[in-house]
Amino acid sequence: MSRTQQAPMNAGSASGVQVASPLSQDNSTIRVSGTLRLRGDNGTRNNGEDLTTTRHIRWSEDVVDNEGMGKKSSKVCCIYHKDRPVGESSSESDDTDSSSDDCSDCDSDTRIPTHKGDQGGEASSRCSPSRLAERKCGTSCSKRHSKQRSRRHMSPNAYEKMPKFKGQPGKR
């Protein structure tokens, strides 16, 4: 037979421990079996505040409806666009340099081809083969020759597109 003993609970704690110990103790073998019973929080804080109301998001009157869909969300979605100089368009790439960059192996007034299909002309006789290959690829002299892929046209992502409403065609 075993008896069940309950440990005293603190006033601020909602969990308790029950320890079961055997009644008869044999000196040769002590066998202890324990049962741990866990209970959830009773729903109040130490100051008597109800947790069910404090854990939920409360929307103030100035919260804007998320994209007109009748939903309010606590997630913040920001799309960062890097600041650009006034004359630079958003379609220009930050990684590529223009063909007017000076190459140490070429004359600055020599036309340097920037695409694979362009003919080198005088530039092929004055530039080293590695520099010419870099210039035909459109990369600057200091960059590696591995960027041969053309960049795809950038389209707006899901957060930048306006949602389509089924009930109101053409409005919004």
From Swiss-Prot:
Any one GO molecular-function label of the UniProt entry: protein serine/threonine phosphatase inhibitor activity
Biased composition (Basic and acidic residues): 108-119
Biased composition annotated in UniProt, kind: Basic residues: 142-154
Gene Ontology terms: cellular component: nucleus
The keyword Nucleus belongs to this UniProt entry's keyword annotation: yes
Entry's transmembrane regions: none
Signal peptide, first to last residue: none
Pfam family, one: PPI_Ypi1
Task performed by this protein: Regulator of type 1 phosphatases which maintains protein phosphatase activity under strict control.
Designated name of the protein: Type 1 phosphatases regulator ypi1
Organism: Aspergillus clavatus (strain ATCC 1007 / CBS 513.65 / DSM 816 / NCTC 3887 / NRRL 1 / QM 1276 / 107)
Gene expressing this chain: ypi1
